[in-house]
Amino acid sequence: MKTGFWQQVLPKRAGRRKEHPVQYMPHKKEENATGLMNPSLHTSHSAILK
């Protein structure tokens, strides 16, 4: 029974992670201005998205 439970929960968590970057997209656009001044910060953000 536990395996079936996790099979239902894990896909939902994976789906949430995929939606996570989309929810913060407007926020990332605001950080883009600071990212231009701080290239290292911008690189770390793009690395996380990929």
Curated annotation (Swiss-Prot):
Query: Looking at the record's lineage, which domain of life comes first?
Result: Bacteria
- Region entry Disordered, spans: 1-50
- In this chain, composition skew of type Polar residues spans 35-50
Official protein name in the record = Uncharacterized protein TP_0799
Q: From which organism does this entry originate? A: Treponema pallidum (strain Nichols)
Give the lineage: Bacteria, Pseudomonadati, Spirochaetota, Spirochaetia, Spirochaetales
